[in-house]
């Protein structure tokens, strides 16, 4: 079902699963809670809502007797799938993460300057319908940090108290990189 009245859709008896994909975190939390209240399962594509309210949403879904999930195919859900696989195989999981091409000067990028870093002109980006705020969030590290928070919420892994540091490391370097491996 598709429609302009989200509340009617959430209440519709033929709807079993709601896919929340507004990209608006505050609205997404409202949509999820309303869906749970009407006995609907939720697949949440709005990862920002999960990063900020994921444990609450999971708890509310469980209380309502429905399922709450991240969207499979998006990076956070794929990371969670790998964590689940490793734990099922009996491996102790001490860290999970994602690759991200990050260079120090990316932290100074803004939506007004982002296209130079992607090798695009503003005209090309506009023609392609590309959102400078979204593309900047991938570049400056804020989107990977939000996605990492969603992974921590879903897996029970913790995040460092001093934040995500994005240490430069190859796959072979990971076990010997102090900011990646657990502190003892």
Predicted regions span which residues?
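A structured beta-alpha segment of the ubiquitous adenosine-cofactor-binding alpha/beta core
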Residues: 1-17, 22-26
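Conserved active-site and cofactor/substrate-binding residues in soluble primary-metabolism enzymes
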Residues: 4, 13, 52, 73, ...
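Rossmann-fold NAD(P)-binding glycine/threonine-rich loop
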Residues: 22-38, 45-85
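Short glycine/serine/threonine/alanine-rich loop segments
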Residues: 40, 65-67, 91, 157
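Conserved anion/nucleotide-ligand pocket segment
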Residues: 81-159
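Glycine-rich, aromatic-lined ligand/substrate-binding cores of catalytic
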Residues: 144-184
């Amino acid at each position: 079902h598709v429609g302009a009245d989200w509340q009617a859709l959430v209440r519709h008896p033929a709807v079993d699963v709601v896919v929340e994909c507004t990209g608006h975190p505050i609205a997404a939390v409202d949509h999820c809670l309303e869906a749970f209240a009407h006995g609907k399962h939720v697949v949440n594509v709005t990862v920002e809502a999960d990063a900020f309210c994921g444990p609450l949403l999971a708890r509310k879904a469980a209380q309502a007797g429905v399922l709450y999930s991240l969207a499979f195919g998006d990076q956070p859900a794929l990371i969670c799938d790998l964590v689940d696989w490793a734990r099922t195989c009996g491996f102790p999981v001490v860290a999970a993460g994602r690759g991200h091409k990050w260079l120090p000067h990316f932290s100074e990028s803004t939506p007004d300057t982002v296209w130079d870093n992607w090798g695009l002109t503003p005209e090309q980006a506009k023609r392609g319908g590309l959102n400078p705020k979204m593309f900047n969030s991938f570049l400056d590290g804020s989107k990977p940090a939000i996605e990492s928070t969603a992974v921590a919420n879903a897996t029970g892994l913790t995040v460092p108290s001093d934040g995500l540091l994005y240490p430069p490391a190859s796959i072979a370097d990971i076990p010997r990189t102090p900011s990646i491996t657990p502190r003892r």
